[in-house]
Amino acid sequence: MVPLAEQAAEELEGEASAEVLDIRTLKPLDEDALLASAAKTGRVVIVQEAPRTAGFGAELAAILAEKAILDLRGPVFRVTGYDVPYPYWSIEDAYMPSVERVADAARRLLEF
């Protein structure tokens, strides 16, 4: 998802600056980097392939709600796979997060 997030950040050039944080490991999670980025930008869009419900993105959002809520200028947005069984390859592109969905989430967050 990192290359996709980087493409979305490029699409936003001229509208806003974006910082893409690559969470390379789940254990140990670099919580300091996550919190520093939230404090620096004031806005967070989490992108993950997994379905929205019970995904790791929800855990990241919970950490931000507990530890960075006063640094945020809006809600944490998540761009995820849909809450449906993972589809066959023929419709996978409709299921997966896209550059357009990520950029749209960032634009909506900027308007918050």
Which positions does each model-derived feature cover?
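Thiamine diphosphate
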Residues: 1-112
